[in-house]
């Protein structure tokens, strides 16, 4: 919000990744639109590398007040009922822990060149644009563009804990490719870490905590899309180092500091944090050699410490 981008564009897998945005007494659970939709001055775009569930997208545009500024690239792939059915049974569901959204089977059909595209769907006709073209027009006018990804680095099809991964590449380079943005046009890469590690479904997790320990620490969470309880472990510096390397990160954002340090809830300046929280942030910076510039201290969009100059 502070950076006032004229475009907020989503790359990544979709709609198997859910994001929760809180604005006062309103809670938005998002699967298709980028979280930056709250910025009323920004166009909200979905890049051509993203697969789209038209029903979910149209519902979000209507319910979240994004009509007239939400658009979809003509080359976005389309999730159909057959993809959801394939995703909700068999090994994908039972062994990999798929969310059942149809994302994986749709991406598989895209690789086989049989997937329908957004430009072929009548209900999306008034939302169809050329997303890369709009992005580059904005950049030529020296406007800010915010590119938002989905999932996490270690759910990447190439770099993650295969086979317990999502169906495509979700590191920064993959997200940029999804929206048609070349590497020389990227100014900053902000890698987002929770103050502890979570994972939904199956797959490896170092130093995983028992459910009782998770509850005792107050770290209990449930997936936005599936509602399944999230597994948890303490902050993992080795994973963080690897994520920074794979994403060429220039800044770190830490979320849920208030869950780890409840006294920090709602704070908006670093000086207000208690000593334990300050030491936690300093240890991250000293160990990872990257500045922590954004700190989330609560679910509301305004519960943020922004340390950028």
Where are the language model's segments positioned?
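Non-transmembrane, aqueous-exposed alpha-helical and coiled segments at domain scale
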Residues: 1-309
């Amino acid at each position: 919000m502070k950076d006032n981008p004229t475009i907020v564009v989503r790359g990544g897998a979709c709609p198997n990744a859910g994001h929760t945005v809180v604005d006062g007494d309103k809670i938005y659970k998002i699967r298709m639109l980028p979280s930056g939709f709250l910025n009323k001055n920004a166009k909200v775009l979905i890049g051509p590398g993203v697969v789209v569930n038209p029903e979910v997208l149209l519902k979000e545009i209507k319910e979240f007040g994004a009509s007239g500024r939400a658009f979809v690239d003509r080359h976005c792939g389309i999730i159909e009922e057959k993809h959801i059915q394939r995703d909700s049974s068999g090994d994908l569901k039972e062994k990999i822990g798929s969310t059942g959204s149809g994302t994986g089977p749709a991406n598989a059909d895209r690789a086989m060149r049989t997937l329908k595209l957004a430009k072929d769907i009548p209900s999306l006709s008034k939302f169809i644009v050329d997303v890369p073209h709009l992005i580059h027009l904005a950049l030529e006018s020296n406007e800010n563009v915010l590119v938002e990804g989905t999932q996490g680095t270690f759910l990447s099809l190439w770099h993650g804990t295969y086979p317990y991964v999502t169906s495509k590449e979700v590191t920064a380079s993959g997200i940029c490719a999804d929206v048609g943005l070349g590497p020389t046009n990227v100014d900053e890469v902000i890698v987002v870490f929770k103050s502890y590690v979570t994972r939904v479904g199956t797959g490896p997790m170092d130093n995983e905590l028992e459910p009782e320990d998770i509850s005792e620490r107050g770290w209990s969470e449930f997936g936005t899309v599936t509602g399944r309880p999230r597994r948890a472990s303490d902050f993992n510096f080795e994973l963080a180092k690897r994520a920074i390397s794979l994403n060429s990160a220039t800044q770190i954002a830490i979320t849920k500091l208030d869950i780890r340090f409840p006294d920090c809830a709602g704070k908006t300046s670093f000086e207000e944090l208690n000593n334990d929280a300050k030491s936690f942030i300093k240890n991250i910076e000293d160990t990872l050699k990257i500045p922590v510039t954004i700190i989330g201290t609560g679910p509301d969009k305004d519960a943020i410490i922004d340390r950028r100059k």
